[in-house]
């Protein structure tokens, strides 16, 4: 090794050591000036020998070029959300559910943490080196923020210590301390820049900067709280043990993590944290309570998109009184019509509130609300303002009733409210302007029609300029019209036109999924396509006939039936076919003639597959006579469980359904 290589290695090791002491142990040994001197020395040596610069060098936190947009990263292990409780009674009920499910009379050991009010992120280390980072996004897919996360000094670019797994995905919260937030806003007011409403918004805005040099100037920090991918190594078998191991490897962990051996101890922890909340120096909105034992976590499993072994115990929201001046009705991307109260502006939890959600017609009836009423406003979870109750004793004489619309306030289509649901929805579907942008984005997405290069910003411009009203209009676009869009040159425009032409050749299942019918995901679309075979047969199906499809119940059947009953939707489908959208003729599969262990079986896939994509697995299973369903029920014959299988696996085990792993599936596919 050359002398300069030895110097570089020693300097990097020394700087990483002091970063660990400062950010993780909160026990710096040297003054900032000495740290800066060491960093300057390292930069000077690397300038002499740029060929010796390594990606994990402390000098390489900032250096990536500004991005034009964030790429998407699909989470190999989904980032689930947590269920919430808001009072002691609800927590005690949660504790009892856990004990009942474990069939135990002994107290559960809980690991309690602060619920940080920041941005959830996933950070992947390979052989101890940070290789990628992503936002939570929708839990399945997030944005690639690797360059920005590298600028956060609390996050090590390289882990130190022994027995570091080959692949380790650390999950945690990026947040902004109160002092840093105040400094950012102070600078913004002085320079005429953007002033943030709260530290969470500032943290999110800082982390989503396209230019990492801007992120580097923001005093963001990080605490880790969990793990996603774990390959080529082992971790302790308790949650606290894992956090302590992370800390030993150089990752920051909150010093308020506490083990509680009884429900009362958890409540004491909650009250103490609530009391200390104003002095923490950063925002939290509750505490997170997790079963400490990993074995018990696995036994408890998951439900929907949340674990059964953890809960967020939120702090009470702050409340104020004000008057409802009007009620307007907004239409969301799925057609949900939401009443919104326009309020006399009032400060709630440090934020000026002028609007509050009323959720739905049932909520208005429950509140007994009228326009002009004096109401109590709460910022639920410290974020979303809502009306808690009407102050009936101070009701003015001039109040008037709230009339829920019978037609969509945007497109005029009829509204529907399915039995058993609280939400009223517009039936306009593909022609409703309020739903148009999101419907089109879904239509062109990778798992739907898969139009390469047709990003969200292009869709936004096409709708705003009224170039596109329905999905069929996309296939009428010309390169000349696209060239007029922002950042769209002739070559890019022609590429999009070519991609649209290519997308016309699809499958019946993809086409159904692309239509965006409520509750019809990929698995349901595939089931409908396989059962009915043709669009004509599906359009003519009754609600009873639709329910014969595996995994389709009354709710889904009603949504499908109503979608095809709407004349405007049928018109758009006709236009799409006229523009050349097509798919192969159905292949009739006689299950009795197929010699396969999957023939005639209803199969559910869960977890991540490593040997093939989920789409490929579905296609091969269907080709061998299987019916692939999206959820586990008593009708399910077989569950194929990949890595990080969750609630579907747990339900299959409860019902005694046969479960195999990916390796066994591949063996049977070749049988």
From Swiss-Prot:
List the SMART domains.
BRCT, HhH1, LIGANc
Catalytic activity of the protein: NAD(+) + (deoxyribonucleotide)n-3'-hydroxyl + 5'-phospho-(deoxyribonucleotide)m = (deoxyribonucleotide)n+m + AMP + beta-nicotinamide D-nucleotide
Q: Does the keyword Zinc-finger apply?
A: no
Per its UniProt record, what Pfam families does this chain match? BRCT (PF00533), DNA_ligase_aden (PF01653), DNA_ligase_OB (PF03120), DNA_ligase_ZBD (PF03119), HHH_2 (PF12826), HHH_5 (PF14520), Nlig-Ia (PF22745)
Q: Which cofactor does it need?
A: Mg(2+); Mn(2+)
Q: Which residues bind Zn(2+)?
A: 408, 411, 426, 432
EC number(s) per entry: 6.5.1.2
Record key words, sorted: DNA damage, DNA repair, DNA replication, Ligase, Magnesium, Manganese, Metal-binding, NAD, Zinc
Single GO molecular function: DNA binding
Q: Which GO terms describe its biological process?
A: DNA repair; DNA replication
**Catalytic residues (UniProt):** 115
The residues covered by the BRCT domain are 593-671
Annotated Gene Ontology cellular component terms: cytosol
**Endpoints of the signal sequence:** none
Main enzyme class: ligase
Where, in this chain's numbering, is NAD(+) bound?
Answer: 32-36, 81-82, 113, 136, 173, 290, 314
What protein family is recorded? Belongs to the NAD-dependent DNA ligase family. LigA subfamily.
Its annotated function is as follows: DNA ligase that catalyzes the formation of phosphodiester linkages between 5'-phosphoryl and 3'-hydroxyl groups in double-stranded DNA using NAD as a coenzyme and as the energy source for the reaction. It is essential for DNA replication and repair of damaged DNA.
* NCBIfam families listed in its UniProt record: dnlj, PRK07956.1
Record-given protein name: DNA ligase
Q: Which organism is it from?
A: Salmonella newport (strain SL254)
